[in-house]
Amino acid sequence: MAPFDFRKNKSMSSPDTLQIPTDLLPRDGRFGSGPSKIRGEQITALVADAPTYLGTSHRQATVRSKVGEVRDGLSALFNLPEGYEVLLGNGGTTCFWDAATFHLIAEQSQHLSFGEFSSKFASAAKEAPHIKDPSIITSEVGTHPTAVAEEGVDLYALTHNETSTGVMMPIVRPAGATGLVAVDATSGAGGLMVDANEFDCYYFAPQKSFSSDGGLWLALCSPAAIERIESLAASGRWTPAFFDLKITLDNSRLNQTYNTPALATIHLLASQIKWMNENGGLSFSSGRSRTSAEILYSWAEASDFATPFVTNPADRSNVVGTIDFSDDIDATVIAKVLRANGVVDTDPYRKLGRNQLRVAMFPSIDSEDVASLCACINWIVGNL
């Protein structure tokens, strides 16, 4: 096999033959942006409870108590003010976007669109025939726009962390706005600090910072959001039962889901929330991600072949880091060598189309492993 040219016009070693020294490798090589690394302790806890938990009815006390543990744990983790409630339903964040067009948006929404995922809720609202076309504020990838109060808008849709680009934004109610503030926190929740007083609905899925699996959505809802759900349900607006947030609300108050959930997902989620709360809460979990981010971005800034994709340091995500490489370095080859050596899922988001790596830094990922990843990349570049 001919050598693979890693740097242009130079003879290089084949990436297929490279073995990274074991003393450089991370202890755990999982850096995927979702599904994410699951801690071994979560698996051990699930196995211990499996005989009496798995394969049982989700409407019986065994599972409902675990759902209650999730709801109470999230209330504590996010220090939810009085009157806020935790809702959960099947289908993931994509399902929640559709549900929100029925029972959170009364007439019109405003959306900040600055990447693949932040644009999807805007598309869902635009395609819904029973509400007005949304107002959409965009910015270039690698940046984020700012919400502004707008007449007629009754819901402001923000995104805490744009998973596709590695941009995070502060969650603050738009000045002078009277509508609800709904935040897509799919990859940000649990890994970024947030003040519950700044949102009415903070929704996410558990396969990122919460080290569980997909197919479930959770939403932290203020009294105003609860009132919106109830009033739109009472208005007679037709809603498919799967997207009916009033049905979700009623079932959540009973510590259950409308239809059968994945029990393992709920158990893994409960274990992760417990781990976060027992070690100091959101300041602990977000602190772990912040430390990992400092390591990754400091390495990239000091490198002569890599640089953070997001130019404004304040906008660089603490949970999903995107690192660009110089034109004479092929990031796909780096990812290939890493994978061959057990360091997986560092590939960039496919639709972004950049010569970069994307590194998850969720709370379960040890900061020492992020440092080891950086050392591995240096070794690969030096040996290709």
Residue ranges, per PLM feature:
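Conserved N-terminal alpha-helix of the aminotransferase class I/II PLP-enzyme fold
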Residues: A50-A99, E116, K120, A124
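N-terminal "arm"/small-domain region of PLP-dependent enzymes with the aminotransferase-like
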Residues: F6, K10-S57
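Conserved PLP-binding catalytic core of the aspartate aminotransferase-like
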Residues: T307-V337
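Active-site phosphate-binding strand-loop segment of PLP-dependent enzymes
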Residues: T138-G190, C201
